[in-house]
Amino acid sequence: NYCENYCIYCGFNCHNKIRRAKLNAEEIDKEMAAIAKTGLQEILILTGESRAKSDVKYIGEACKIARKYFKVIGLEVYPMNSDEYAHLHECGADYVTVFQETYNSDKYETLHLAGHKRIFPYRLNAQERALKGGMRGVGFAALLGLDDFRKDAFATGYHAYLLQRKYPHAEIAFSCPRLRPIINNDRINPMDVHEPQLLQVVCAYRLFMPFASITVSTRECERVRDNLVGIAATKISAGVSTGIGSHVEDIEDKGDDQFEISDGRSVDEVYKALLDHDLQPVMN
């Protein structure tokens, strides 16, 4: 959870006084093994945006470890060049998700006060560079609540649509995150993006791109997630932690969470909930 950016809404930002941690290869292996025991066959690897602490080689080694345990590997890391994405693909990564946060470039500058993330165009083009690097799929998201959510949702959808036309083979995915409170700032909230507005965004993505994957994360509560998978969402996470080293008890140097989660159910509990809704759980 080391980061070089100053994003005022994120718990990992470089000026937020939190416990920082970085897992070594042995600790990563332990975490992966613990997660794999739950039955999950897909893993999402995240870092803070610090090339100094989490360089491409380090992320690549994490992908190689993950390949021992999981069929599908996703990345949410800092934007990279095409050759770097190609290296990570060779190490086992299948898809890349990049949150643009907001597509309003003026608002973007007021939210990202320092670090490489301030470079709006470089982040905007990350998904295309990932596809050029051989990634099978790419994910798109705006952090709903930072700016006008309807404009950001429209821009997210159009961004994905343009790349789908240019790269017809690409697997396209949407995430629909709303702002959540962070350590040292529990007043952060998604402003006017309430549950009906979130449903509107999810349904708009589904109507606009019928074959895209739509993820609803543990930022949302159990009730909302259970309802959305019955309407338009296709992927939900389970047994989640946004902290560092939180899946294994004997990792002593644990890092603080990126944000508060709302649905703390285990993999088994989410699996059962899907069955109770007459849905078929698929683990990868």
Place the predicted regions along the sequence by residue.
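Short Fe-S-cluster ligation motifs
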Residues: K30-S50
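Catalytic cores of alpha/beta
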Residues: N81-E90, R136, L146-L162, C221-I231
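Auxiliary Fe-S-binding modules of radical SAM enzymes
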Residues: R165-N284
